[in-house]
Each structure stands twice: as structure tokens, then as C-alpha cells.
Amino acid sequence: MCEDRLKTPDSNGNWGNWHSCLKHLEVYCDEATTFDDIDAEWIQGFKDYLNTAEKDAQKKTDPKVSYVFVGLSQNSKVSYFNKLRACLNQAFEEHIIDKNPMRGIEGFKAEEVAREYLTLEEVKKMAATPCNYPILKATFLFSCLTGLRKSDIEKLTWGEIQKFGKFTRIVFKQKKTGGQEYLDISDQAAAYLGTRRNDVDRVFEGFTYGAWTSLELKRWALAAGITKNLTFHCARHTFAVMMLDLGADIYTVSKLLGHRELSTTQIYAKVLDKNKQAAVNLIPSISE
């Protein structure tokens, strides 16, 4: 059933999670395991396995190579356990099993992850600093100004770019969620699009993101005097925090980011809580 989910995942971005979950299940149990074998004890065993599992489930031990054990992150455990839960729930709903062994079993609790982002001044520094790969600079700054994910930037075509008077709008389907989005962008962001070509042409032709571009992003940031551990996705976080910091209301920011739930956007409001920042300065000086 997990393999079936891999063929038709609910989102393209979720495929990797299903694939990783399947690999860990293959390590935990043998091919002869059936639904009849899965009970509360088996599920608890899988939880215990995830607590001790290595990040790379396919890693082979080579006596000539020294390995450093890297366990699963808390949120990876949450994701993989929930994948198993989804499979068992589906099996129960489709009457493949008479009882759902997952009922009443508590999963892992998600861990809140700090979001790295750039301040407006840092974005200005990045913009003013040369980058060895102009396409990387253009796409990263475009993401800082629009909040678009790199996966959507990679596939963006000119047919998705529309002009409405003075405004530029991107009409596209999110790769991660499949949701239809209507994103108005600023003139400043539109300037990074370049010269319009055929509708089927990619806007940022030649842009792909991998290990070398990740390294180059860090080099570019260091050249700008920024030592934060940047990834391309930090640009999306940067957009969200900048919008809230500049006074945009959270509902509008949520729509611009294409979030399905407002609670997802509220994480950024928590990062930038000016009320708390002001409150801590209310205490008078305690120095004589």
C-alpha cells in the first residue's frame, strides 16, 4: 500500500517522504509481513525502530570507511509514522482489515524548527554582491520578493506570467500542493523575469538547484558578509517575515504564500513578534 502511494502521492513534494518511509519499513520488517502481522506491538516496535534508526536506511556498512551515525530528526519520525498511520487507516476504510491496530496509539510529537531568514538589510547586501552564477542570484532574489518555492520557480513558464495593466500576475499550480494560485508580484520582482519569450519557454531557463548551487549560495552569502546557514528555501521565509515586518496583514501574507491553513503563516508571526520585543523593554533600569 505504501508502494501504491508512491505511484500517486497527494503532492509531488510528498513523494520523497513516502519513498523514505518505505525504505525504513523494508529495514524494519521482512517481505513476508502481512496486515495480519500488524498489531499494537508491531506498531510500537516500528516506533522504537524510528527512535534508533539511521537517517539513510540504505546505508551499507563498509569496514574500510568510518561512518558517523546520524539519526532521524524528530519531524522525520513524525512524517514516517504518519505515513504508516495513513496506510492502515486506508486499509481499514477499504475493509482490507477488520480492525485498525493504529487506533489509540499515540504518534510522535512534532518539533518546532527555527526558520532561517534574511533581514531587509541583508537582502540588500545580497543584491549588491556579485554572484558567480547570475541565474542563481536572479532566482534567489526573485524568491525573496515573491515567496515562490524553488520547485515552482524551476518550472515557471512564460505562459503563467500575465499582465493586468501595470500589475504582473503569476497564475500557476503549486508543485507541492497542486493548488491553483494567483500571485501578484511587484515591479521590482518582475524586473528579474527578463525578456518575455514563448509561452512554453521556462522563465528561468537553465536554473536547477543541487549540491553545487547550494554551495554557491553559501559562497555568495559569505561574500556579502552573511554567515547564516542559507538554503534556497530561506528566501521564502525571508519574504514572509519581510511582509509581516513591513505591515502586511497576516491573511494577505497567507494568501501570497499559498498556505492552506492560517496556522502555517502564524509561525512567521511568532518569529517576528514585535509586541514581545517591546514588552521586554518595559522594565525600568535596575542599576543604581
Question: How would you label these PLM feature ranges?
Answer:
Residues G104-G107, E116, L120, K155-L193:
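Conserved tyrosine-mediated DNA breakage-rejoining catalytic core shared by Y-recombinases
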Residues I38, S79, G210, T227-G247:
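Short basic/aromatic active-site micro-motif
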Residues Q174-G178, L257, E261-L282:
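Catalytic-site neighborhood detector that most strongly recognizes the C-terminal catalytic loop/helix
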Residues M1-V68:
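Basic/aromatic-enriched alpha-helical hairpins
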Residues D56-T61, F69-Q74, V78-N82, E93-I97, ...:
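Basic, Lys/Arg- and aromatic-enriched nucleic-acid-binding interface segment
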Residues L141, L145, S151-D152, R236-R260, ...:
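C-terminal catalytic core of tyrosine-transesterase DNA break-rejoin enzymes
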Residues K125, E181-D187, A191, T195-R196, ...:
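DNA/chromatin major-groove-contacting recognition/catalytic segments
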Residues K175-R219:
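C-terminal catalytic core of Y-nucleophile DNA break-rejoin enzymes
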